[in-house]
């Protein structure tokens, strides 16, 4: 084991975080941890060039989105004594119980009398701890039923699709990131379930109507996909929208006011809504 390693830390606005994570993955960065309201990147190789590239990327995003403030802050790069980071990482990840669903890692034991969802967090697309995912897991236990045709839109690690499959739904998944599709398929294999269809892309590539759609994605993307989502809802279908910061909740409700809002949860600043396709007018 090498004696030293480099650690880069930065804070990024939540709505842009996934863009920076994708940027890091594209540059071959593998050791990434979200903690202390920011992002840690660790490597045995110098991260000076990556730090510089990160700042350039942030500047370009600021220009692209016509922002008058910095997207990232508290950027720091330090050299540290090495540890066994694999073991440290494992210690830091705790299982999560949401009603009767128990989400745990591949190295943690299952919980009796629960629906166990096994996730490999090394695949880097979420382990169920985010407030939005938590809300979706609660809702899916209520609305997932056998034989429903279901879509996990923006599947990430596949947790939500796996839960729907465990409840007997015929599940399809999609994500614009091919690595997310690979992650979801691997996690499905770990849990002994199959997805009926998986594709890299969005809902515009979907065929037919769904009885249940869950979209745990950011508000801006939900607003962009609003018409496509509605066009793929079966009569009386259930639509779960999540990943929505409370400051965007009014806009989401306005866009989906032609559907019946039947449930909602807010945890901290994160909102999740459940709609039924009883279209008004």
Curated annotation (Swiss-Prot):
Residues holding S-adenosyl-L-methionine: 133, 154, 175, 216
Keyword tags: Cytoplasm, Methyltransferase, S-adenosyl-L-methionine, Transferase
EC number: 2.1.1.-
GO terms of molecular function: protein-lysine N-methyltransferase activity
Keyword S-adenosyl-L-methionine (UniProt): yes
UniProt-listed InterPro entries: Ribosomal_L11_MeTrfase_PrmA, Ribosomal_PrmA_MeTrfase, SAM-dependent_MTases_sf
Record's keyword annotation contains Oxidoreductase: no
GO cellular component: cytoplasm
Example GO biological process: methylation
Subcellular location: Cytoplasm
Catalytic activity: L-lysyl-[protein] + 3 S-adenosyl-L-methionine = N(6),N(6),N(6)-trimethyl-L-lysyl-[protein] + 3 S-adenosyl-L-homocysteine + 3 H(+)
Main location: cytoplasm
Pfam families: PrmA (PF06325)
Function summary: Methylates ribosomal protein L11.
Sequence similarity: Belongs to the methyltransferase superfamily. PrmA family.
Database matches in NCBIfam families: PRK00517.2-4
Name of this protein: Ribosomal protein L11 methyltransferase
Organism: Campylobacter jejuni (strain RM1221)
Lineage: Bacteria, Pseudomonadati, Campylobacterota, Epsilonproteobacteria, Campylobacterales
Gene expressing this chain: prmA
